[in-house]
Amino acid sequence: MAEEGWRLRPPTLEDCDELGRVHMAVWRDAYAGIMPADYLAGLSEERSADSWRDQLSRATSSPTRTLLVLDPEGDVAGFGSAGPSRDEDAPTDWELYVVNLLPHARGTGVADRLLDEIVGHREATLWVVEQNARARAFYTRRGFVDEGGRSEHPATGTAEIRMVRRVTR
């Protein structure tokens, strides 16, 4: 499937309910069989939407870059966000926080464009669920490597790894 017709744009407060729905749908799909089923079933679209409202209401003072992915019909099909690293021991100053896409957006090329827009050519780190083979393959293709950092998802204990992308000049 080609990327034709897919668009990126910054989110607005009016997008928060849809973002909450998409965010939870992506998690339920991507982490099925990886995270506990009861945890995924309990994810709240309303709480996610409220969290998005909170984030976006403070966004003007933040260097964080967040973009929505709109499919050819104009519906929200995902989002991505990056900003200053949150780790005290971060090997880079910039962190890719998230790239979340609904299944129909995967394989279209829009994830590459999204990553280019929110991270650019800078060095960056990210955390990814260790068992999320699809995401790890995407990040590896984009120059990220496992740098040895390990953590656990706070609510589930699911293993996470830190990946880093270095820029050679």
Can you say where each PLM-predicted feature lies in the sequence?
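Acetyl-CoA-dependent GNAT
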Residues: 6, 10-14, 21-34, 38-106, ...
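A conserved catalytic-core signature of glycosyltransferases
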Residues: 35, 96, 128, 134, ...
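Conserved GNAT acetyl-CoA-binding A-motif
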Residues: 120-131
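Conserved active-site alpha-helix within GNAT-family acetyltransferase domains
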Residues: 108, 112-113, 131-158
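Terminal substrate-recognition subdomain of acyl/acetyltransferases
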Residues: 2, 160-169
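Acidic pyrophosphate-coordinating catalytic loop
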Residues: 46, 87, 127, 152-155
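Secondary-structure boundary/capping motif
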Residues: 49, 53, 127, 141-142, ...
